[in-house]
């Protein structure tokens, strides 16, 4: 039988049959998998026995290390306007890791009722043709266009805690997961999601995962940092050297620095890029 792992708890695997969508809970990994030091993760396509073991893991089309998920069709990156406040640095961190794995992205901007200037904060990303939806969870409305984008795909949900991921999932899939308000003292959300799991309803599937503190950047290389910034791509081919990292090179040798000087690249996006390079050099994410 062929299925997909939808949840892992304490070494047990919940698997959904791909043909009839029936759930088979509490399966174990076979001795052969353990012998090969192969660990199944959420999203894996597997061969399994109905009342026993997972026997085979199929090749993954993509994979994140932490949270451990595989075979993502697209990522839903949540970012709030207020509580917690919008941060282009935080958003670029998410985009860096997701786009380095060539995973398509949809930006979901929440809490738009808290700031009438919400669209201006995302202008740079709109100019880069990101697919952006503005969400007001309190109105309990999900745009029809967004539903069409999510249908028949495995959608990976990621974002800082407190931005409204759980509220969105509750509204979208008619679930009743726990919701925590933003922490007043730290201006950060309290975690409500404890395990990585695939939540399914009809033709919609969403991977819910713990919040930002468990997200890992250690899997990103220096080249991937350079290549992940979409705003650089239209200029970088004009750099004098193919190995240009747009940092220590002279302005006349670096097309990115020239575009920055001419106002074609926003200064804050370039500063975010330099921040990631600096963190990489220190190996401190």
From Swiss-Prot:
Cofactors (names): Zn(2+)
Ranges for domain CP-type G come to 61-215
Keyword Lyase appears in the UniProt entry: no
GO BP term, example: ribosomal small subunit biogenesis
Q: Which residues hold GTP?
A: 110-113, 159-167
SUPFAM superfamilies linked: Nucleic acid-binding proteins, P-loop containing nucleoside triphosphate hydrolases
- What does the record say about how the cofactor binds? Binds 1 zinc ion per subunit.
Origin superkingdom: Bacteria
What are the protein's UniProt keywords? Cytoplasm, GTP-binding, Hydrolase, Metal-binding, Nucleotide-binding, Ribosome biogenesis, RNA-binding, rRNA-binding, Zinc
What terms describe the molecular function in GO for this protein?
GTP binding; GTPase activity; metal ion binding; rRNA binding
Q: Name one GO cellular component term.
A: cytoplasm
Task: Give the record's family classification.
Answer: Belongs to the TRAFAC class YlqF/YawG GTPase family. RsgA subfamily.
Q: How does it assemble?
A: Monomer. Associates with 30S ribosomal subunit, binds 16S rRNA.
Q: What protein does this entry describe?
A: Small ribosomal subunit biogenesis GTPase RsgA
